[in-house]
Amino acid sequence: MFREKLRREIEIIKNNGLYRFLRKKDDGVLDFSSNDYLCLSKHPEVIEAVKEGLKYGAGSTGSRLTSGNINHQRLEEKIAEFKETERTLVYSSGYATNVGVISALCKKGDLILSDKLNHASIIDGCKLSKADVLIYNHCDVEHLTNLIEENWGKYNNLFIVTDGVFSMDGDIAPLRDLKKIADEFNAILIIDDAHGTGVLGDGRGTLKHFNLKPSDNIVQIGTLSKAIGGLGGFVCGIEEVVEYLINTSRSFIFSTALPPHVVEGCIKAFEIIEKTDIVKKLQKNIKIANKVFKKYEFIKEDNLTPIYPFIFKEKTMEIAEHLIKNNIFCVGIRYPTVPKGLERIRVSINVGHEKEDFELLCERIKEVYSSD
């Protein structure tokens, strides 16, 4: 009975053209799907640090509050220094960080104002928080202000929650404006900088990109699985925020800690970002990609981040399959990850790509797609 019910549901998903399946990325393909923007996951120094970290064992064997607190505080100290903030807390994943931080800090009687295009982990954290949630139009400062003014005085606390860099479009939140609004209305600004850390502001993220300094009303969230090339997530803020989360954040308290060898790799990754020009190399590659992609008319304006949405709508999955058949790994993104009518090939570039790689990608796409 249960099996048949699930089969019917899966068939509906297939009939609607929304069926997902797991695909193995073959060796030797040209990869435009990875979030490993700085290629640190394969950096020799990072790999060596991971090997050295195996002296602690293959796993952490418990949560941070039991047997799992091994070398994690060294990583937290490194991130806090890197992000120029008081303190950092490391979680087992970026998803767990957003869910755990938002659901712990935001409570019944509070109001969350969340950007329309925020990541699913933010949306889930808002749902778990028991706070009221209002969605403001994407990066629309005027709409956000109007919502706050309409609800002023009705709630105990106000939280503005936004991605720093939006994962599907690669655009940047207007943090300078959001910070002004947070200051004016005594709100807390929570920034998920998963795609900004290691990319913008000399690698220190979106806040640094706008020359903004950490403050008491800013909570920064990040991931260790994208530009850092490892696994896990983190939250940065004032001392009291971290102390509170250690005691109340369920996804921190009840999750097994990151494996210690992964922690060592992440520490080394931050050191590489600090001591080399690897972030500048990424920014140089973004400028090269901008020229190529504009030449082929896949973008109209220059990007500041390594995420490029090529909107192909109903042709998206056909193009994605064509690319894979030609040894280019670049996945199609469709509803419900993105709105209907905005299906796209999400192109992620990294420091390892060459101009010729961008040209090849565009040529292969042109074989099945014409903008005319």
Swiss-Prot record:
- Gene3D superfamilies in the cross-refs: Aspartate Aminotransferase, domain 1, Type I PLP-dependent aspartate aminotransferase-like (Major domain)
Q: Name one GO molecular function term.
A: 8-amino-7-oxononanoate synthase activity
Transferase in keyword set: yes
Establish whether keyword Transferase is in the entry: yes
Question: What metabolic or biological pathway is this protein involved in?
Answer: Cofactor biosynthesis; biotin biosynthesis
Q: What is its EC number?
A: 2.3.1.47
Q: Which UniProt keywords apply?
A: Biotin biosynthesis, Pyridoxal phosphate, Transferase
Q: What class of enzyme is it?
A: transferase
Name positions with the PTM N6-(pyridoxal phosphate)lysine: 226
Instruction: Quote the record's binding site residues for pyridoxal 5'-phosphate.
Output: 94-95, 167, 192-195, 223-226
Q: Which cofactor does it need?
A: pyridoxal 5'-phosphate
Q: What chemistry does it catalyse, as a reaction equation? A: 6-carboxyhexanoyl-[ACP] + L-alanine + H(+) = (8S)-8-amino-7-oxononanoate + holo-[ACP] + CO2
- UniProt binding sites for substrate: 20, 119, 337
Q: Which InterPro entries match?
A: Aminotrans_II_pyridoxalP_BS (IPR001917), Aminotransferase_I/II_large (IPR004839), AON_synthase_class-II (IPR050087), AONS_Archaea/Proteobacteria (IPR004723), PyrdxlP-dep_Trfase (IPR015424), PyrdxlP-dep_Trfase_major (IPR015421), PyrdxlP-dep_Trfase_small (IPR015422)
Similarity comment text for this entry = Belongs to the class-II pyridoxal-phosphate-dependent aminotransferase family. BioF subfamily.
The task this protein performs is described as: Catalyzes the decarboxylative condensation of pimeloyl-[acyl-carrier protein] and L-alanine to produce 8-amino-7-oxononanoate (AON), [acyl-carrier protein], and carbon dioxide.
What assembly does the database describe for this protein?
Answer: Homodimer.
Q: What is this protein called?
A: Putative 8-amino-7-oxononanoate synthase
Gene this protein is translated from? bioF
